[in-house]
Amino acid sequence: MRSIKVAVLLSGLLAGGCASGTNTWVELDGQRYQVEIADDDAERARGLMFRDEMAADHGMLFIHDQEEPQAYWMKNTRIALDILYFDNARRLVSQQRDVPPCALGNGCPPYPSDAPARYVLELNAGEAARLKLENGAELTFSPAIPRP
């Protein structure tokens, strides 16, 4: 397996690092989530690390430079998450549900996508099941989210 893109999925962003606020939202299967954006290496590496909670209607959207196989891990992540992978067309191509927190540092396992992805959405664990998400679901972006 190629080296894990230290797109350390979930991490708690740097102050002022990621775009956030009421204008940055995504919609998935009729449910709107306020998202923080991680669109550079530093933001993707930090992700949701060191957070103790995330509001029910919030998440983090990781934007990669190109569509390719992705692998995320839970290093220093304290909350369980659903990791959802989307292609260039913003269609759901892979899901890692109910991924547990990991305190093993570099010993945390990877959670790879089953198909190439450009966008990764992290939500609180259980959201994918609650929405009954199936691959092919479309992710809609608010106008404030940057388009690569």
Place the predicted regions along the sequence by residue:
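Sec-dependent signal peptide recognition
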Residues: R2-L9
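C-terminal motif of bacterial Sec signal peptides marking the signal peptidase cleavage site
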Residues: A15-G17
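Compact, glycine-rich, soluble single-domain proteins
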Residues: A19-P148
